[in-house]
Every structure is written in C-alpha cells, then in structure tokens.
Amino acid sequence: MPPKRKTLNAAAEANAHADGHADGNADGHVANTAASSNNARFADLTNIDTPGLGPTTTTLLVEPARSKRQRVSRACDQCRAAREKCDGIQPACFPCVSQGRSCTYQASPKKRGVQTGYIRTLELALAWMFENVARSEDALHNLLVRDAGQGSALLVGKDSPAAERLHARWATSRVNKSITRLLSGQAAQDPSEDGQSPSEDINVQDAGAKTSDFPHAPHLTFSAPKSSTAETRTLPGPVRPPISANTLENNLQPDGTGIGKLPPNHWRLLDIYFSYTHSWLPILEKKDMYQALYQYSEQGSLLPSANVESGVHAELWSALALASFQAAATAASSATGPASAAHGHDNAINPSPADISDTARKLIPLESGPFQVQHCRALLLLCLVSLGRDDWESAWLLVGFAVRVLLVVRTQLPPDDDRPRPRMRALLVACFIVDTIVSMRHNVPAHLKPDDIADLPLPEDGQDQWEPWTPCEGLGGEHTMLQMLRNPAYPLSTFNHLYGVTKLVALELLPRIRTSSQNAPLEFRSRLQQVIGHNSPFSVFVLSQDTASAFVPTAYLTRTVYLWAAAFSEPLNEHYSHLLIETLDQYQKRFGTYAIPPLIPSLLDSLLALKKQSHSSERHRRHLEELFPAYSSIWPRGGRHSNTGLQPIRQLELPPTATATASIMPHVMEQPLSTSINPVNDRFNGIPNPTPYNSDAALDAITQTNDYGSVNTHGILSTYPPPATHLNEASVALAPGGAPPRPPPPYVDSTTNHPPYHSNLVPMANFGYSTVDYDAMVDDLASIEYTDAVDVDPQFMTNLGFVPGCNFSDISTYEQ
C-alpha cells in the first residue's frame, strides 16, 4: 500500500510540474488553481489513518491553495468586442497592455431587466406622494380593497384594457423618463424641456376603460364647471359679476383671506346641523355630507382630485352656513357688545357666517344651470338662513327658486328610474312646508299649492328615524342630562307631522279665513288631531292636557306647530296661545334659545297678525307683541333691516307699583282663562316689531265677537285644564346659563287664608335677576272677587277633579 500511494503522489507532482510551465498563457493561473486543488485533495488522502495499518506518512511537501479568481464588474471595450477575458484594471487592463492595443471604458452599459434601484425609487416616490398629496393613500387603498376586487384586478391584471392603458401612460410619462435618467447616471431634465407630456397624447377613449368607470373610484381629474354666459341674477342680494369656472376654482382653492376653505370648526357646525335642523328637516344624506367633507384637506382646502361640478359642495356649505349662524348667535349671547364672531371682519382665520353663506350661494348656478337636486337642497337651506335673519324677501325668492329647480330636475329624470323618487318627493314636501309658512306670514302667493302634492305620508322606517339624538354643548340648555338619555328624535315622523299640519291649514283654514269665517268648524279640529294620531311617537306629549316635558327638540317643535294651528283656527280663544307660549318657554330652557328652528318666528308673527285683525283682547295682543319679536331677532338681521350686531335678549320689567298692576286687572276679569298669563313670564324688549302682516284685504270681513268665557268643550283639546297649570318641576330643573327655574305664578283665593306663593327674585330672559314689589301685586289680587269668575264656569272645577258646583269655600271648610 505505501508504494502505491507514493506512485499517486508522484503522478500528482508530475502533473503540477507540467502545468507550471503554462503560466505564460492567459489561462495559466486557472490551471494552477486546479492543480493546487488536486494537490490539496491528494494531500488529504495521504493523511488518512487506515484501520489496522497505523498512520501513514508522506515524503512530499504540499503547496498552499491559491485564492479563487474573482469576476470583474466591467470589462473594457476591446476585451468585450474580442470576447476575451479582462481583469478590469483601469485605465488599461493587462490583456490590452500585453497585446499593445488601446484600452477604453466608454460604451454605456445595457443591462437586462430593471435597473438597479428602480423598485426602491418607485417606493420612495409613492411615500413622498402619500406625505405631500393629501388623502392620496386613502384613494389608492380604497382602489385596492373595495369594489369587489375590481380595483386590485386593475393593478395586477395582465389582460385588462384599463391596465394596459395605465401602463402605456406610465411608460410615456415624464416621471418615468426622469427616473430612467437618474438611474443611468444622467441628470434629470426639466419637464418643460420635454414639451407636452406624452401621456396627454394617448387616446384614453380607445385605450380601454377608465379608472372612474369602476364604482366609487375616486376622480383623478380636476375639471371646472361650464361657465355661465348669463349676466343677470334672479335672487336678491348685492349684484355680482357672472360666475365663471376660474372664479369658482379660486373660491374653492385656498387664498390669503381664508375664504373658500372650510371653517376650522366645520365638524362642530355639521354636528349642530344634524342635531337641530336635520332632526326635523331630513332632506340631506349624511353619507354624502361626510363624503364631500373628506374631499377637503386637513387645512380646509379642496383637493385637486375633487369633483367641483358636484352639487354636494353647495349643500355642504349651505348646511355649514345655517349652523354657523346658530353657533355665532350662541357665542354672542355670552359676550358683551356686538358679536364679532357673527360678522368675522376682524378675524382673518375664521370665516364669518355671512362669508360661508356667500360661498354656498356662489356654488349654486345661475338661472341658466345646469342644476342638480343638491342645488335645490342648498337653496332651501339658504332660505332658512334668510328666515333666521328676518329677511323674508330673500327667503320667499329663494324658496321659489328651489321649487322651480326641483321641477326642472324632475323633468330630466329617466322615466324608468325610480331610485331618486323618494328623496325627490321628500324634498318637494320640504319646499311646500317652508313656502306655505313664508307666504302665510307676509300674505303673498305661495309657489306650491296643496293640490300639487299627492297624499303621503312618507315612510317612517330608515336610519334617520332611529338614530339617537345628541345635543351640542355650548348652545344652552340641559345638554349634560340629555346626552345621557340618547333618545331618538324621530325625524321622519316629525317631518310627516309638519307636512300634515301645514297642508291642513293651507287646504281648509286659509280659505275660510279669507272668506270672513270667524272660527274653523269642529271638523278642522278633529282632522288636526288625526294628523298627529294616537300612535305617533309624540302623541301623548303633543295632545297632553298640561305642559308636559320631553327630551328631544322635535317633540317641542311638533307641539308648537300643532298649537299654532289650533290657535290660528280660533284667533279669539287665548287658551292655545298660552299653551304655545309655555311650550316655547320650556323649549328655550331645555335646548337653548338659538336652537329654535327659523320657522318658529314666522309662525308666531302670522299668529300675532291674525289676532290683531280679529280684534282679540288688547292685553293679550300686547303680551304677544312683547314676546314674539324676540324669537325673530336672535340672529343678525339681513336685507333692508340689516344690523351690525346681535340684539341682546332682555326682559320687560313689570310695573313696580300696584297702580300700574291694577290698571291691567280689569282685562283679566273679562276672561277667566286669561289668568293663565304668568306675571313673571320671561319677556323681551328693545327689539323692533317685524313688518306688519299685510292681510287687510283678506281679513277685512272678519267681524268682532264677544270673547270666550271658557274653553270650548267640543274642541280638539276639550279636556284641557285652565292654562294656568304650572310647569313640571322636573322638566325645568335647569335653565340656560345655570339659572334656577322660574317660580310658578301666584294664585290667590279670597276665601282662604293660605299665604300666596311668590318670590322677590324673578329670573330674566338674559338670566339675570330683577327685584319686583310683589307684595302690592298680591294685595291687589287678593282684593279681587276671583271666585265669582270661577262660579260662572262649573267646568273649571270639574277639570280640576272636583264635583260640579264645588267652590273653594267648600274645600276650605272641608280642610278645617
């Protein structure tokens, strides 16, 4: 065995020696490497211990292994052309030097596949776009995860025409060329040097489906609406030049003044709108409002990807305008002096409510159109803004414009498309409600007649119907307690009630009043009660016999409209008016003064004008004149009666002497029911009366009759007790601003010795206090033979729960 291994070692040495003479060749070092490897392998064999033979020894020295040849990163131009091995040494490689030829490295490399760093460059470019282009990440994410996989198929599909179109656009884009130049070591050129983008030369109509063809895909283009050539305006207000596309874009894009940006408190304004307007006028779609709001950046400016032509921006800004006036009036009530928040001229950051309203009006096309159903909603909300500012001319014109825009849009709908019909019908009903109330207040023709609308009601089963109502903090009222209750406001039921009462008044009551009918017949009161119904959510509260309490504002609004119609049907009966005043007073205490809908002032003014024409008692009219105008002046006025600030709400101080009190007491004795007027009721002064109700021609034939001595027991509220019923203590536990509830009115019976309940501190409407000498008033009340008036009406004691014919003398004797 040892001689045989020696022969192998000798052969290996001979081979290595023979290979050593080939070092002069270009591949000599490769052969040496192979020989060294063989020597190492044979050396390992010589060191193997053979079992039973003992360790083996070798008599030859093994050479160390040489390093493996490394591949050069780049060969020279000459070796590459001759297909020779090159060591890559610059400026001249060894093969070129040995052959005496020039060596150059000038040819540009042409690598196969993507260039080095291409994927990372695209990733960094996307990350930069996510940081600098607002909501671009959300748009791309929605494309990937939504639409039943259609968006992901667009990006990863191979045979999709839309994918081919997008890939062709990227391949010819300036960004792709710039990235290619950067990765190849060249400087990226200015895009202006390339001229027009090659992507603009692609015929997108023939290249396949667009991204926008997929459902809910975000719009990636910024297009301006068609400019209007009209030079006249049909709406009131300052005359402005025609609104062009550039003007519209400039209004929506951020500028130095901040107009055109969303107000910083836009989320709060939207909450105010949904809590205090959408709860009784559900004409907007919440999802559309949120979707439109997300098309603005965090700074409030409109994103370039937003669709400016959509009318949803007009209704969004109109809703913000309506809520901004309510928020500004609330802020002004807690500040001294004129409210700068309402006009905003000294605040360059927050736009004023008037500026927001102007922006909303600019987003609505002129009479030449084109119109969408959202423009009708925006016009109707701007009409409510004008009503709140006591600018009835603008309100009347705006609601007329909204009606005609709606009729135009309805004619453009496809005959076989019934999807938008329910919302269009609800919008038509909303226009009818507002139009009827505005026309009744100012005795002007209505744009819609009751016969123009088919019998409803609208379906009362939807998401809006069952959403819990949440108050907004800062508008006054008992928001802490109400937030814990989370009761539904039933917007759809409230909307149907408003429509039913308004249509009944317009269909049956107004014609009778214009034909000199003194009071509505019993059929009207019966139908009025049927409109509310006994199965509706608020039937118990609306038809209650006393001033009950509720926890949502829509219940108070329904009761207010119901009592207004009842009082309108019997202008000489003061019972409904007293209940109406108490309901509004409780509404104000629970939800705040500025949460009252703008329709309420029109209802009150029309009722006051009717009572003036029907020759009701002077004391009652004077009381209404002092109270009603306060509700129509809570917002900054506009139009011809424009004011510079909000009118503070104050209280009329009662006459401090007994003489002044005694002067009005004979009027109290004329009607027993009039004693329900609380002498400590909150009243207001310092506010001018609104424009008189011009209804002389319509009501000139109404004859004067005797005042009612008691409640008509056959009426719709036949079981009502005297209107002097006290408010429920639980319902008025807190007043706005933390003021305690108003004490109940004093009641004095001359036949008893019980001391009257009175207080020397009277809470005012501005939540202050004023000292009043009630001792003199109580003495005067005690000197009046009030029991005589009670004996005249036996039904009075029956309503209190006693047997007919019972008087307070009998009760006092029984107690003793």
From Swiss-Prot:
Top-level taxonomic group: Eukaryota
GO MF term (any one): DNA binding
Span list, region Disordered: 184-235
Cellular component terms (Gene Ontology): nucleus
Matching Gene3D superfamilies: Zn(2)-C6 fungal-type DNA-binding domain
Keyword Phosphoprotein among UniProt keywords: no
Biological processes annotated in GO: DNA-templated transcription; positive regulation of transcription by RNA polymerase II; quinate metabolic process
Residue spans binding DNA: 76-103
Localization (cell): Nucleus
The keyword Metal-binding belongs to this UniProt entry's keyword annotation: yes
InterPro entries from the UniProt entry: Metabolic/Drug-Res_Regulator, Transcription_factor_dom_fun, Zn2-C6_fun-type_DNA-bd_sf, Zn2Cys6_DnaBD
Main localization of the protein described in the UniProt heading: nucleus
Protein's job: Transcription activator; part of the qa gene cluster that mediates the catabolism of quinic acid (QA) and as such, allows the use of QA as a sole carbon source. Activates the expression of qa cluster genes by binding to a 16 base-pair consensus sequence 5'-GGRTAARYRYTTAYCC-3' present in the promoters of the target genes. Regulates its own expression.
Record protein name field: Transcription factor qa-1f
